[in-house]
């Protein structure tokens, strides 16, 4: 059960007594997050985020705590919630709450609480002072959608009928928020200078809204910064996926057959993760380019219908829906392990198993028994396995992602008038800056171009070194 502080109700955490433990781990993480620490040193005195009120929706982990404290060190005020019901690290949330930042996050929170907490991070008003959020930092798009749909409802529009429990709770929370604070979300949307979005799924939502001409403020697509997608998505998953599967099941990967659905950056890292553990890896793909990449990396590319007959472990990494169906799971081997490393829980038809016998082995590990007696293991109920069953990506790779997020927030706050209501990526020179900030920690020494060499290839001596269309 969540506990509240005696002197304030402006946070919800599992146990505020975990704050000291959280602070110790935050201190360690700071030594592995050179990009964020460099931004504190560079911008701390100038306070470029002074006056910014950031509504943040992103996994409440130790690494996110370092991001939050970087934003506040640069002058921002922050209200924070997690973006996944299983991803919170309770000691991290406690440490941030104890520092005075309003945070609403409990590992294993209900969907009802999740959406109520999204409402809490938008409620900036104190004593009817009229304050609202003026920036959003999002992961998956839930906070952005809450604000946009809130403004639409206040304008008299209606939402489509909910199709699942998630949508039921979102609509309930929105209506409750509007009833308590009518007109406030409309005012909020007008005040927002922009949103920076962390992940592939959220970026897809933003592009969809922008294509319809309905995006009311600029958005920065952090996910497609090279120092995010080619590092967090690839190298992060390469380390965190097998960590989660092993913590959840104690399975020996060596010799097993594993299937990865999707061979984008996350799928590439996941497939390498499993292969490095000794598994024989199959890949499913819809895209001929990604399928060819997988084949030339030595992976066997098959359909899911074939994979279910052969595999012991299944990982979805597509960002799509119904990738593993109830029929697929019914055809799997006894004690097959099924999990997802995409942002939402739509990739595996978990709801279709609701009427079968579920046995919780431990938190985020369930045995599901089919009518014929066969069982499969479901991790994190089909939600993000690396954050549900483990602690997510290592601090170092998250430093690159969160340095991008911080730079995006500075860009939106200080230069928003230079952006239209569209989706942008950070300029190449900032992408290269993020990479450069992480080299010393690894002992990397860059070669410097001479002026003659720079002229020869047509780039500045100090960069940027690649055109925007270059594919790393």
From Swiss-Prot:
GO terms for cellular component: cytosol. Pathway: Amino-acid biosynthesis; L-homocysteine biosynthesis; L-homocysteine from S-adenosyl-L-homocysteine: step 1/1. Keywords: Cytoplasm, Hydrolase, NAD, One-carbon metabolism. It comes from the Bacteria. It is found in: Cytoplasm. Binds 1 NAD(+) per subunit. Its EC number is 3.13.2.1. The keyword Cytoplasm applies. NAD(+) binds at residues 199-201, 233, 262-267, 285, 320, 341-343, 386. It holds the Pfam family AdoHcyase_NAD. May play a key role in the regulation of the intracellular concentration of adenosylhomocysteine. This is Adenosylhomocysteinase. The lineage of its organism: Bacteria, Pseudomonadati, Pseudomonadota, Alphaproteobacteria, Sphingomonadales. The gene is ahcY.
